[in-house]
Amino acid sequence: MEKARPLWANSLQFVFACISYAVGLGNVWRFPYLCQMYGGGSFLVPYIIMLIVEGMPLLYLELAVGQRMRQGSIGAWRTISPYLSGVGVASVVVSFFLSMYYNVINAWAFWYLFHSFQDPLPWSVCPLNGNHTGYDEECEKASSTQYFWYRKTLNISPSLQENGGVQWEPALCLLLAWLVVYLCILRGTESTGKVVYFTASLPYCVLIIYLIRGLTLHGATNGLMYMFTPKIEQLANPKAWINAATQIFFSLGLGFGSLIAFASYNEPSNNCQKHAIIVSLINSFTSIFASIVTFSIYGFKATFNYENCLKKVSLLLTNTFDLEDGFLTASNLEQVKGYLASAYPSKYSEMFPQIKNCSLESELDTAVQGTGLAFIVYTEAIKNMEVSQLWSVLYFFMLLMLGIGSMLGNTAAILTPLTDSKIISSHLPKEAISGLVCLVNCAIGMVFTMEAGNYWFDIFNDYAATLSLLLIVLVETIAVCYVYGLRRFESDLKAMTGRAVSWYWKVMWAGVSPLLIVSLFVFYLSDYILTGTLKYQAWDASQGQLVTKDYPAYALAVIGLLVASSTMCIPLAALGTFVQRRLKRGDADPVA
């Protein structure tokens, strides 16, 4: 007798699982960057439009497919058509790539969390040099937060070619991160369903606490004004619309197979349309809410740096030209500098290299995303707060909850097709399959803890999923609407939920959403082609800054392999099915 499929304890567990998976680090470190780059408040216009015409329809489609077929990604697409099993395989491959490197972020968060209990915070000051006559040269040229990230955390090599060895402290943190993930997925929906209550809700508690603290910081209003002041001209920028569509697409986690896996554990009568709307709205609200928190903190950091710059320049000019204490202010500094340059040209030119141009606007314009925002900009702001240890613990605990929540979805996308397979599940219990997946990912993930690990992390982060996911979701929409049949799919949903599918969803699925995906695919493909030689940012310890370098030939080969290994699953699986059927038909033909 076939074993009954496990179910979520209730629909709330399912919603929390989807929120925990979809709401991730991208909401905290990419959306604020896009707001900063594309006109602050005006970026919300293309973002909300793309949410309505792309995000909600595609999320509803994946949830409906999972709930209707009641299988993981491979089984679900094979049921729709035997020629489409490669779509599910491609999703599993992409999720496997993501799991390989994504948990390294959780390892870094653990590393920073453990160091957050020190007083003072280890990234708040530069260490002394070897003979204790001054500060470390690399740290002085960079900053204490950059030094802690690049040297103490990553111990980064000067280039991708110099791999170095595995760093044992980050490696232990990665081992811990995978152990936590394994314990969370050990019993399938039974254990995951309980964990997601925490991973989905606790980040909001921390964000609310941070919002209250952020709004009380000196200079927070400067950051919020910068965010909410719209630059209307950006609405005419095609890249603003492209990036809005991209952010919606990737922040919801479409194409990985995780949403299909989660929905497959629903009751058939579950209202997946309502849940798709709820999850997508909460995801977008979180991005905007996190941006308010980020820009209040960012405003504090920018104001702190700006006022520090003013103090240093004022002190330098006061001491050099014997000015009266307190004479120089923010309002007259530029005017006095101009006067001193004309009145004492030789003296002023000698000290000119030490005189910085202090500008609050330029501080706010400095755009940072990804790990730079999470582990450098935020820590720069935290170190200047009162009771900095508390704020550091809260922040990195929040990052962990977001990261672990996303990892639960990533691993579900891999595990569900494996446990659905009768061949595998008949020989291995669920706990063993989960353990093997975690062990393999952890072992491969050790590459990212090497001295060149951060460069490999960037390669996987930039190229493992982008084009592959666009192609996967494009094939998904075409498969449902034109292979399985939109009318047939519509009648299935009505039979399951008792509700008719509105014309809006059908128009989006059959026309608008696929056209948007094709547009994104063409944009990214042309962008890669026009870019020419692919480059990466390498850390130069002698300068204390990042420098641009060309990827070596073997790295380009890895990038090509990452893209091809997932996308080629779709045509190869279809070809394999075709050949298999032809052979069977040939065997069935009578001998003449």
From Swiss-Prot:
What's its catalytic activity?
Answer: L-proline(out) + chloride(out) + 2 Na(+)(out) = L-proline(in) + chloride(in) + 2 Na(+)(in); L-pipecolate(out) + chloride(out) + 2 Na(+)(out) = L-pipecolate(in) + chloride(in) + 2 Na(+)(in); sarcosine(out) + chloride(out) + 2 Na(+)(out) = sarcosine(in) + chloride(in) + 2 Na(+)(in); N-methyl-L-proline(out) + chloride(out) + 2 Na(+)(out) = N-methyl-L-proline(in) + chloride(in) + 2 Na(+)(in)
**Residue ranges that the Swiss-Prot or TrEMBL entry lists as coiled coil:** none
Q: Which SUPFAM superfamilies match?
A: SNF-like
* Bilayer topology: Multi-pass membrane protein
Cytoplasmic face of the membrane: 1-5, 64-79, 187-194, 263-276, 411-431, 487-504, 576-592
Q: Name one GO cellular component term.
A: plasma membrane
Residues modified by carbohydrate are N131, N357
Alphabetized Pfam families for the sequence: SNF (PF00209)
Query: What PROSITE patterns has UniProt attached to this entry?
Result: NA_NEUROTRAN_SYMP_1, NA_NEUROTRAN_SYMP_2, NA_NEUROTRAN_SYMP_3
Question: Transmembrane stretches, by residue range?
Answer: 6-26, 43-63, 80-100, 166-186, 195-215, 242-262, 277-297, 390-410, 432-452, 466-486, 505-525, 555-575
What GO terms in the biological process aspect are recorded for it?
amino acid import across plasma membrane; amino acid transport; amino-acid betaine transport; glycine import across plasma membrane; glycine transport; L-isoleucine import across plasma membrane; L-proline import across plasma membrane; proline import across plasma membrane
The free-text tissue note of the record is: Kidney and small intestine. Expressed in the S3 segment of the proximal tubule. Expressed in neurons.
Signal sequence interval, chain numbering: none
**What does the annotation give as the result of altering T199M?**
Common variant that contributes to hyperglycinuria and iminoglycinuria in patients carrying variants in SLC36A2, SLC6A19 or SLC6A18; results in SLC6A20 inactivation due to a 8-fold decrease of Vmax
List locations, semicolon-separated: Apical cell membrane
Q: Which residues lie on this side of the membrane: Extracellular?
A: 27-42, 101-165, 216-241, 298-389, 453-465, 526-554
Q: Which UniProt keywords apply?
A: Amino-acid transport, Cell membrane, Glycoprotein, Membrane, Symport, Transmembrane, Transmembrane helix, Transport
Q: Chief localization class?
A: membrane
Q: Give GO MF terms, alphabetically.
A: amino acid transmembrane transporter activity; amino-acid betaine transmembrane transporter activity; L-isoleucine transmembrane transporter activity; L-proline transmembrane transporter activity; neutral L-amino acid transmembrane transporter activity; proline:sodium symporter activity; solute:sodium symporter activity
Extract the InterPro entries matched here: Na/ntran_symport, Neutral_aa_SLC6, SNS_sf
Q: What does this protein do?
A: Mediates the Na(+)- and Cl(-)-dependent uptake of imino acids such as L-proline, N-methyl-L-proline and pipecolate as well as N-methylated amino acids. Also transports glycine, regulates proline and glycine homeostasis in the brain playing a role in the modulation of NMDAR currents.
Concerning its family, UniProt says: Belongs to the sodium:neurotransmitter symporter (SNF) (TC 2.A.22) family. SLC6A20 subfamily.
Q: Which PANTHER family match?
A: SODIUM- AND CHLORIDE-DEPENDENT TRANSPORTER XTRP3, SODIUM/CHLORIDE DEPENDENT TRANSPORTER
Which disease is reported for it?
Hyperglycinuria: A condition characterized by excess of glycine in the urine. In some cases it is associated with renal colic and renal oxalate stones.
Specify the protein name.
Sodium- and chloride-dependent transporter XTRP3
Phylogenetic classification of the source organism = Eukaryota, Metazoa, Chordata, Craniata, Vertebrata
